[in-house]
Regions:
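Short secondary-structure boundary/capping segments
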Residues: 4, 69-70
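Amphipathic alpha-helical dimerization/coiled-coil segments
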Residues: 1-10, 14, 85-105
Length: 105
């Protein structure tokens, strides 16, 4: 980032919404599963042992912040991470959490 160049407030507001969405364990579990590929609500529900209504609710929140996207496949909705930036953000957060002493002090 250039010196004296600040990110605009609207963008920072969107960033806070992204971090709010990421602050839930079940949403992170869903996103980590989607890191391996696309999945339906039923598959996510079964794999993570969560109710389908809870999975659908969490996906709606993740979709509202553009962390996941969906497409129709027959009668099912198939979900995936929105783009490579989301995948990178998730991987970096997991790496940061699993290596707490790399930053010094």
């Amino acid at each position: 980032m250039e010196q004296n160049k600040h990110t605009d407030v609207d963008t920072l507001s969107k960033v806070t919404e992204i971090f709010k969405a990421l602050s839930d364990l079940n949403r992170l579990r869903i996103m980590e599963l989607l890191e391996f590929g696309e999945a339906s609500v039923g598959h996510i529900s079964h794999t993570l042992n969560m109710s389908q209504s809870n999975v659908s609710h969490q996906l709606k929140l993740l979709k509202s912040t553009h962390l996941v996207k969906s497409k129709r496949q027959g009668q099912s909705m198939i979900y995936s991470l929105d783009d490579i930036h989301v995948s990178t953000l998730l991987k970096q957060a997991i790496h940061h959490a699993s290596h707490p002493n790399e930053g010094g002090s």
